[in-house]
Amino acid sequence: MGEAFAERVAVVTGAASGIGAATARLLAERGAAVVIGDVAEGADDVARALRDAGHRALWVRTDVTDEDSVAALMDRAAAEFGSLDVLVANAGIAEPKAPLHELDVAAWRRVIEIDLTGVALCGKHALRHMSAAGSGAIVNVSSILGAVGQANSSSYSAAKAGVANLTRSAAVTYAASGIRVNAVAPGYADTPLVAGLPADVRATMAARQPIGRLARPEEVAEAIAFLASDAASFVVGAILAVDGGYTAV
């Protein structure tokens, strides 16, 4: 796809590693100036590597649960590079697995704040810039667990289902304004979080996906880049499953 994002500015949250880092690299390779919003200092390493490769990139320390922090991220992107054309709302955390009757309310609130409210805040403040420009593309990161049930997954499943319907609502709200909003719903992917799990757990995850393996972060990044690009100009409100067939069963 060459320079599909030439002269465009993309904000990617949660890009210190995994899907976010792969997405930041891919968008930069295709011409975008990339602004990474993350609390983790590893995001600075990603941005530095992109600059060393000749791309435009910077890291802005961002807490997606803090509205002022999110607003500052979007404003910095627009001020530094002249516009804000693409948002990839990827920042998220996992949950402590437990049945609902053993719910840790503090942990529930933390997951909802980061995985759902954080996406909403990023959209809110990206849309300030996109609405003024009359164009833009937002890609939120949901999950297969936003579409299907899994035992002992309360907060994460609720948050990711919320992201999916938040995406649909925003999509129909802003489509006529030249702003497209879509989401990806990844299956189990070979991210650092998963890499730290026992081998038998990783094998079970892979076996649940008809394709028989974990997704590579770069494969999910390709789907995100498609939805953010002009190639998806008529795609609005889609929740694109990138799950190796998990939700097709």
Swiss-Prot record:
Gene: chcB2
Domain of life: Bacteria
Species assigned in the record: Sinomonas cyclohexanicum (Corynebacterium cyclohexanicum)
Annotated active site: 156
Top-level enzyme category: oxidoreductase
Gene3D superfamilies: NAD(P)-binding Rossmann-like Domain (3.40.50.720)
Residues annotated as signal peptide: none
Subunit record text: Homotetramer.
Record carries keyword NAD: yes
Enzyme Commission code(s) on record: 1.1.1.438
Protein name: Cis-4-hydroxycyclohexanecarboxylate dehydrogenase
The entry's keywords: NAD, Oxidoreductase
UniProt catalytic activity: cis-4-hydroxycyclohexane-1-carboxylate + NAD(+) = 4-oxocyclohexane-1-carboxylate + NADH + H(+)
Pfam families membership: adh_short_C2
PANTHER family linked to this entry: DEHYDROGENASES, SHORT CHAIN, ESTRADIOL 17-BETA-DEHYDROGENASE 8-RELATED
InterPro entries: NAD(P)-bd_dom_sf, Sc_DH/Rdtase_CS, SDR_fam
Induction: Induced by CHCA, trans-4-hydroxyCHCA and 4-oxoCHCA but not by 4-hydroxybenzoate (4-HBA).
SUPFAM superfamilies: NAD(P)-binding Rossmann-fold domains
Family of this protein: Belongs to the short-chain dehydrogenases/reductases (SDR) family.
